[in-house]
Amino acid sequence: MTYKYFAWLEEQGFRDIAGVGAIHIQKFLLACSEHYAPSTIHDIRLYLKKLYAFLYAAGQTEDDYSALFSFAVNREKRVFPVLPKADIAKLLDTIDRSTVKGKRDYAMMMLGTVLGLRACDVIALKLTDLDWLRGEIRVVQSKTSNPVILPLTQDVGEALKDYILNGRPSAVDSEIFLRINAPHTKLAAAVTVGEIYRDCCIAAGLPVNKRFHNLRRALGTSLVTNGISVYDVAQIFGDKNVNSTKPYLATDVEHLKMCALSFAGIAPVGGDLQ
């Protein structure tokens, strides 16, 4: 996208960044708004914000434009279906825990199911993050940089213990989850967790996708459905604000039914309502 921005500047007669001001940046964003969806405009804003932060730090621009990119973009919020509890149970039960791979994969799926950890936090989890005496898992979330202390529940603890003692290869890396095949190094990226989740779905005969986040979403919905406020869920999940937690309200069907209005007193138009 920065390439398109520079190409647009050339079309406007600029040969370098000198002379480009706030009015030109705003004009580019307005031009983009005529062709791109709000979600794309949101990304363009972030790209330009990082670009100008770099240019300002490098002394290529005299002005700090960070405030210029502080505007909010109203993006369409998608409501993803919630993975049923029966499907989650089937997914976990299908994993063959007699193998090294099964022990590792089961422990990872349990962290997502019971504690709602993101894939990026699962692969970053270190042996030193586990406090067995206190029964705690200490995580500095990759997405928010928020430190979170989670309970090391018995089921999660048993899954981790089984993998660490009976499956995890000896390695220099301190990360808990390692590659099955040599070299036994840490998992390269969060997408690997998504691929493992996909394979588990295939084995369980469930709809196939790579959204390990489905487990976090299912837990969030379960908490809200059981009367936990979105503010408390945000604290449990380590979210910076409730905006990340509010979508769980949209999947709480039972409580949404209580908010539905009846058609009593509303005269039908164009025929009777069936």
Predicted stretch roles:
Residues M1-Q274:
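Conserved catalytic core of the tyrosine transesterase superfamily
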